From Swiss-Prot:
Top-level taxon of the source organism: Eukaryota
GO process annotations (BP): regulation of transcription by RNA polymerase II
One Pfam family named in its UniProt record: CBFD_NFYB_HMF
Similarity-based family: Belongs to the NFYB/HAP3 subunit family.
Recorded name of the encoding gene: NFYB8
Origin species: Oryza sativa subsp. japonica
Biased composition (Gly residues): 190-206
InterPro entries tied to this protein: CBFA_NFYB_domain, Histone-fold, Transc_fact_NFYB/HAP3, Transcrpt_fac_NFYB/HAP3_CS
Coiled coil feature spans: none
Name of the protein this chain belongs to: Nuclear transcription factor Y subunit B-8
Annotated compartments: Cytoplasm
Length: 219
Protein backbone atom coordinates (compact mmCIF):
# COMPACT_ATOMS: atom_id res chain seq x y z
CA UNK A 1 0.00 0.00 0.00
CA UNK A 2 1.54 3.36 -0.97
CA UNK A 3 2.57 5.84 1.66
CA UNK A 4 0.02 8.59 2.19
CA UNK A 5 -0.57 11.47 4.55
CA UNK A 6 -4.30 11.52 3.90
CA UNK A 7 -5.89 12.72 7.16
CA UNK A 8 -9.49 12.64 6.06
CA UNK A 9 -10.35 9.67 8.26
CA UNK A 10 -10.25 7.20 5.38
CA UNK A 11 -12.01 3.83 5.53
CA UNK A 12 -10.69 0.99 7.63
CA UNK A 13 -10.69 -2.59 6.37
CA UNK A 14 -12.80 -5.23 8.09
CA UNK A 15 -13.54 -8.89 7.47
CA UNK A 16 -12.51 -9.89 3.96
CA UNK A 17 -11.31 -6.41 3.02
CA UNK A 18 -14.82 -4.93 3.07
CA UNK A 19 -15.04 -1.23 3.75
CA UNK A 20 -16.64 -0.19 7.01
CA UNK A 21 -19.96 1.61 6.93
CA UNK A 22 -20.23 5.34 7.68
CA UNK A 23 -21.79 4.50 11.03
CA UNK A 24 -18.82 2.27 11.86
CA UNK A 25 -16.48 5.11 10.96
CA UNK A 26 -18.21 7.43 13.45
CA UNK A 27 -16.82 5.45 16.35
CA UNK A 28 -13.22 6.01 15.27
CA UNK A 29 -11.02 8.87 16.32
CA UNK A 30 -10.26 11.29 13.47
CA UNK A 31 -7.25 9.89 11.64
CA UNK A 32 -5.67 13.36 11.57
CA UNK A 33 -5.49 13.33 15.38
CA UNK A 34 -4.06 9.82 15.39
CA UNK A 35 -1.43 10.78 12.82
CA UNK A 36 -0.45 13.87 14.80
CA UNK A 37 0.10 11.83 17.96
CA UNK A 38 2.09 9.21 16.11
CA UNK A 39 4.38 11.81 14.53
CA UNK A 40 5.30 13.19 17.96
CA UNK A 41 6.96 9.86 18.77
CA UNK A 42 8.95 9.71 15.52
CA UNK A 43 11.94 11.62 14.10
CA UNK A 44 11.15 14.71 12.05
CA UNK A 45 12.06 13.00 8.75
CA UNK A 46 10.01 9.85 9.43
CA UNK A 47 6.87 9.05 7.47
CA UNK A 48 3.83 6.96 8.35
CA UNK A 49 1.99 4.81 5.84
CA UNK A 50 -1.76 4.97 5.50
CA UNK A 51 -2.31 1.41 6.70
CA UNK A 52 -0.23 2.14 9.83
CA UNK A 53 -2.40 5.14 10.60
CA UNK A 54 -5.59 3.15 10.09
CA UNK A 55 -4.33 0.29 12.25
CA UNK A 56 -3.54 2.60 15.15
CA UNK A 57 -6.80 4.45 14.57
CA UNK A 58 -8.78 1.25 14.96
CA UNK A 59 -6.70 0.12 17.92
CA UNK A 60 -7.09 3.28 20.01
CA UNK A 61 -10.76 3.60 19.11
CA UNK A 62 -11.40 0.03 20.23
CA UNK A 63 -9.48 0.66 23.44
CA UNK A 64 -11.62 3.70 24.21
CA UNK A 65 -14.82 1.77 23.54
CA UNK A 66 -13.62 -1.14 25.69
CA UNK A 67 -12.81 1.02 28.72
CA UNK A 68 -15.87 3.21 28.35
CA UNK A 69 -18.20 0.20 28.07
CA UNK A 70 -16.88 -1.25 31.34
CA UNK A 71 -17.26 2.10 33.09
CA UNK A 72 -20.78 2.44 31.68
CA UNK A 73 -21.79 -0.94 33.09
CA UNK A 74 -20.58 0.19 36.51
CA UNK A 75 -22.64 3.37 36.31
CA UNK A 76 -25.75 1.45 35.28
CA UNK A 77 -25.38 -0.89 38.24
CA UNK A 78 -25.09 2.13 40.51
CA UNK A 79 -28.00 3.85 38.73
CA UNK A 80 -25.89 6.79 37.59
CA UNK A 81 -26.04 8.49 34.21
CA UNK A 82 -22.70 10.28 34.16
CA UNK A 83 -19.34 8.56 33.70
CA UNK A 84 -16.52 10.36 35.49
CA UNK A 85 -12.75 10.01 35.53
CA UNK A 86 -12.78 7.72 38.55
CA UNK A 87 -15.08 5.31 36.72
CA UNK A 88 -12.62 5.09 33.83
CA UNK A 89 -9.69 4.46 36.17
CA UNK A 90 -11.68 1.73 37.89
CA UNK A 91 -12.46 0.15 34.52
CA UNK A 92 -8.78 0.16 33.52
CA UNK A 93 -7.83 -1.55 36.76
CA UNK A 94 -10.59 -4.12 36.36
CA UNK A 95 -9.61 -4.91 32.75
CA UNK A 96 -5.90 -5.33 33.52
CA UNK A 97 -4.48 -1.97 32.48
CA UNK A 98 -3.02 -1.11 35.88
CA UNK A 99 0.11 0.41 34.35
CA UNK A 100 -1.98 3.28 32.98
CA UNK A 101 -3.77 4.03 36.24
CA UNK A 102 -1.07 5.82 38.28
CA UNK A 103 -0.10 8.44 35.66
CA UNK A 104 -3.75 9.00 34.81
CA UNK A 105 -4.60 9.49 38.49
CA UNK A 106 -1.95 12.18 38.68
CA UNK A 107 -3.29 13.85 35.54
CA UNK A 108 -6.88 13.71 36.81
CA UNK A 109 -5.86 15.28 40.12
CA UNK A 110 -4.06 18.16 38.42
CA UNK A 111 -6.93 18.66 35.99
CA UNK A 112 -9.44 19.01 38.83
CA UNK A 113 -7.18 21.45 40.66
CA UNK A 114 -6.97 23.68 37.60
CA UNK A 115 -10.72 23.54 37.04
CA UNK A 116 -11.33 24.49 40.68
CA UNK A 117 -9.00 27.48 40.42
CA UNK A 118 -10.74 28.64 37.25
CA UNK A 119 -14.15 28.38 38.90
CA UNK A 120 -12.95 30.34 41.94
CA UNK A 121 -11.41 33.04 39.75
CA UNK A 122 -14.61 33.30 37.71
CA UNK A 123 -16.71 33.70 40.87
CA UNK A 124 -14.38 36.38 42.25
CA UNK A 125 -14.40 38.25 38.96
CA UNK A 126 -18.18 38.22 38.81
CA UNK A 127 -18.42 39.63 42.35
CA UNK A 128 -15.98 42.44 41.58
CA UNK A 129 -17.83 43.31 38.39
CA UNK A 130 -21.16 43.49 40.24
CA UNK A 131 -19.67 45.82 42.88
CA UNK A 132 -18.18 48.13 40.26
CA UNK A 133 -21.50 48.48 38.43
CA UNK A 134 -23.44 49.93 41.41
CA UNK A 135 -25.87 52.57 40.03
CA UNK A 136 -24.65 56.17 40.60
CA UNK A 137 -28.02 57.07 42.18
CA UNK A 138 -27.45 54.55 44.98
CA UNK A 139 -23.94 55.87 45.58
CA UNK A 140 -25.28 59.48 45.69
CA UNK A 141 -27.97 58.47 48.19
CA UNK A 142 -25.40 56.74 50.38
CA UNK A 143 -23.13 59.80 50.31
CA UNK A 144 -26.04 62.11 51.12
CA UNK A 145 -27.06 59.94 54.06
CA UNK A 146 -23.52 59.95 55.44
CA UNK A 147 -22.40 63.51 54.69
CA UNK A 148 -25.59 65.62 54.85
CA UNK A 149 -27.58 64.09 57.68
CA UNK A 150 -27.78 67.44 59.50
CA UNK A 151 -28.94 69.53 56.56
CA UNK A 152 -32.45 70.97 56.88
CA UNK A 153 -34.92 71.50 54.11
CA UNK A 154 -35.36 75.13 52.95
CA UNK A 155 -38.33 76.90 54.49
CA UNK A 156 -38.28 75.08 57.81
CA UNK A 157 -38.89 77.48 60.70
CA UNK A 158 -36.51 77.96 63.63
CA UNK A 159 -36.80 75.20 66.15
CA UNK A 160 -39.18 73.41 63.85
CA UNK A 161 -39.30 69.70 63.07
CA UNK A 162 -37.58 68.70 59.86
CA UNK A 163 -37.41 65.47 57.89
CA UNK A 164 -34.16 64.27 56.35
CA UNK A 165 -33.78 60.80 54.83
CA UNK A 166 -37.06 59.78 56.46
CA UNK A 167 -35.88 60.60 60.04
CA UNK A 168 -37.25 63.47 62.23
CA UNK A 169 -34.65 66.06 63.20
CA UNK A 170 -34.72 69.25 65.27
CA UNK A 171 -32.66 72.35 64.72
CA UNK A 172 -32.59 75.94 63.62
CA UNK A 173 -31.35 76.19 60.07
CA UNK A 174 -29.60 79.32 58.85
CA UNK A 175 -32.13 81.84 57.44
CA UNK A 176 -32.31 82.28 53.70
CA UNK A 177 -30.19 85.05 52.14
CA UNK A 178 -33.25 87.30 51.63
CA UNK A 179 -34.22 87.04 55.30
CA UNK A 180 -30.64 87.81 56.33
CA UNK A 181 -30.74 91.01 54.25
CA UNK A 182 -34.03 92.07 55.89
CA UNK A 183 -32.63 91.50 59.37
CA UNK A 184 -29.55 93.52 58.49
CA UNK A 185 -31.77 96.38 57.22
CA UNK A 186 -33.87 96.42 60.43
CA UNK A 187 -30.75 96.45 62.58
CA UNK A 188 -29.42 99.43 60.64
CA UNK A 189 -32.69 101.36 61.02
CA UNK A 190 -32.85 100.60 64.73
CA UNK A 191 -29.30 101.83 65.18
CA UNK A 192 -30.09 105.19 63.57
CA UNK A 193 -33.36 105.68 65.48
CA UNK A 194 -31.77 104.99 68.86
CA UNK A 195 -28.80 107.35 68.46
CA UNK A 196 -28.33 109.46 71.57
CA UNK A 197 -30.24 107.10 73.84
CA UNK A 198 -29.00 107.21 77.44
CA UNK A 199 -29.37 104.38 79.90
CA UNK A 200 -32.29 104.88 82.24
CA UNK A 201 -33.66 107.84 80.26
CA UNK A 202 -37.03 107.78 78.65
CA UNK A 203 -36.14 109.93 75.69
CA UNK A 204 -33.83 109.61 72.75
CA UNK A 205 -32.01 112.00 70.53
CA UNK A 206 -35.01 112.54 68.33
CA UNK A 207 -37.24 113.52 71.31
CA UNK A 208 -34.77 116.17 72.43
CA UNK A 209 -34.74 117.66 68.98
CA UNK A 210 -38.52 117.87 68.98
CA UNK A 211 -38.52 119.69 72.34
CA UNK A 212 -36.07 122.30 71.14
CA UNK A 213 -38.22 122.92 68.13
CA UNK A 214 -41.32 123.52 70.21
CA UNK A 215 -39.44 125.97 72.46
CA UNK A 216 -38.22 127.94 69.49
CA UNK A 217 -41.73 128.25 68.10
CA UNK A 218 -43.05 129.44 71.51
CA UNK A 219 -40.42 132.10 71.69
Amino acid sequence: MPDSDNDSGGPSNYAGGELSSPREQDRFLPIANVSRIMKKALPANAKISKDAKETVQECVSEFISFITGEASDKCQREKRKTINGDDLLWAMTTLGFEDYVDPLKHYLHKFREIEGERAAASTTGAGTSAASTTPPQQQHTANAAGGYAGYAAPGAGPGGMMMMMGQPMYGSPPPPPQQQQQQHHHMAMGGRGGFGHHPGGGGGGSSSSSGHGRQNRGA
